Swiss-Prot record:
Family, as annotated: Belongs to the universal ribosomal protein uL16 family.
Single GO term (MF): tRNA binding
GO BP term (any one): translation
Gene symbol of the encoding locus: rplP
Protein name: Large ribosomal subunit protein uL16
Known role: Binds 23S rRNA and is also seen to make contacts with the A and possibly P site tRNAs.
Length: 136
């Protein structure tokens, strides 16, 4: 799974995804891409599940780029623990995805296979998405 090698701080604020993406809104590598419509927090496990679903559909042909990286540590308190006594331990890593952000890109496969792979990857993510083409 994706995780940063080094961090400046162990824990982070919860934060919100409010505005549209300022960067990463256009296709940079592939011919087809998966673009977010909503702003939401996507975990490293969800990104990995989407990657596996897409590569399995592509039968390991072509190339898949992941344009997002989980760099925000999300902390969680254990079950049945009373309020207070500090913030919980870091549990997993996530990325805050803004609306309009390209998350996956595909190149080197036929159009119908690329569209199917991106649909399968989209089903694994908690964000509403749409598929974009380079020539649109």
């Amino acid at each position: 799974m994706l995780a940063p090698k080094k961090q400046k701080f162990r824990k982070a604020h919860k934060g919100r995804v409010m505005s549209k993406a300022k960067a990463g809104m256009t296709l940079a590598f592939g011919s087809f891409g998966l673009k977010s419509i909503d702003g939401w927090r996507v975990t490293a496990r969800q990104i990995e599940a989407g990657r596996k679903a897409a590569t399995r559909c592509m039968k390991r042909q072509g190339r898949l780029w992941i344009r997002i990286f989980p760099d925000v540590p999300v902390s969680k308190k254990p079950a049945e623990v009373r309020m207070g006594k500090g913030k919980g331990a870091p549990e997993f890593f996530a990325v805050r995805v803004s609306p309009g952000r390209i998350m996956f890109e595909i190149e080197g496969v036929e159009e119908n296979i690329a569209l199917r792979a991106l649909e399968l990857a989209s089903a694994k993510l908690p964000v509403r998405t749409r598929i974009v083409r380079r020539y649109e």
